[in-house]
Amino acid sequence: QGVAVQFCLPKTAWPPTSLWQRFDKAAAAWQPRTAIAVLDKIIVRATAEKAYGHLVKAQIARGGLTIQISPDSLDAVAAQMAAEEQRAKSPVLRAVYATALGKLYAMQQRGINRKAYQQKSRDCFARALKDPDLLAKTQAKTYEPAVERRDMSKAFGGDLLHVVAGEAKEYGLLNRYYEAHGNRRAACLAACLDLRENHSDWLYTRSGKQHYQHAIDSLINVYQDLDECGELAIDHYEAMDEDAKDIVERRIRYIDWAIAKWGAWPRMNILRNKRTDLTAPQFNISLQERQMLPGKERKIHIN
């Protein structure tokens, strides 16, 4: 059972990129023992030089490869990572290890122990998030777990809190924290992500889409003075009723309205591209018969 964890590393990355290139090459060729040997070198150097982002990345990659080689080794890998968490003297580093361990457990979606692992994952994330003030004061550039939408990171101030909470899918916590501390831009995005994470299943039915739209519109009323509200507008568009008779006209009107209000939000190009698609020339072709035989003429009606 494989574990794949993506990390975003700074351009001035330590250790030398050649080590990670050697790891990538070995992993791509499915030479796990060679890849683990390279990771061990990275772990030793990262530990000595306190390059924590690379250290965590290497530890998780090593654990993932070990589990791929021996699927029954998850508990041993997790125990080793938990020991690293306990040995860490920095509370920030302990939070990062707890996050990594929580992610490792969270990715175990199969097997009879799935529910137990999910609970362990929640426990790890709870440890990681027990001091949100500390995480909010720590810049994430030293610790580089992947963020689902890195273009949102600026609003979050580049802090470690949004990285850890994002991995834990605790967007509601983020929304409440940022609201309480006056960062409405981050609170808006956190509310949007929380809605996506917990209520995306509403989008599968017409009535559910209506509930989703109402929830989005409530958030828009709160955050409409912010450019970040454009992210909510994107979700509103995606939830529009596809079966409405005038859906194309309604969508175009909504896009124009949203762009006029929040056009500065970088991801509004999504709606601009949607508008281009909606207004592109279209035609329909109808065939009188379902089967077409070679060498036999058929009439094609183009509307």
Which residues fall in each region the model found?
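Extracytoplasmic/secretory-pathway proteins
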Residues: 14-303
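Bacterial Sec-dependent signal peptides at the C-terminal "C-region" and cleavage site
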Residues: 1-15
